[in-house]
């Protein structure tokens, strides 16, 4: 039997990873393969905001004072060694949806499996919101930063203590998640 050369082995290994990711996406992320309608996104955003207000003390007045909210009700992250995440959401201003967006990010490192999370991005000033809306694909860490907020048990969200123009919250089925970053996530406008 003839040994394969290094480039050939490397090429086969790459395709094994690609096939593995495709199978993983097919098993766990079948529901993300079909883009949601505008109505489906709006209903999911409503539910996500209701859950956010229930899970995070003081969030209702905080959200009411925001200049804009970018909500991704379900962002799926899947990977085998390297992976990615995808979700669809809506930008709301004054309680009304004005645009639809998707989010994508790639990740590398030790990982296997899939998980779902909700992302709520809050624009606290007009300039930050305007800069976001005028961009053609806005990437966290490149086009601007998002301060991911964590709140300890027994404390309430207080906007007077937040000095950042854009803040973000990441939640899973159990509530607010800790030690997460949105660095590298890209938000792009969709036509709906």
Regions found by a protein language model. Name each.
Residues 15-28:
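Bacterial N-terminal signal peptides
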Residues 34-192:
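Small-residue-enriched, tightly packed secondary-structure blocks
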Residues 10, 25-28, 33:
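Compositionally biased non-globular segments, especially hydrophobic aliphatic-rich helices
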Residues 2-3, 21, 32:
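Helix-centric, low-specificity signal for extended rod-like, repetitive segments
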Residues 1-12:
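N-terminal secretory signal peptides that target proteins for export/translocation
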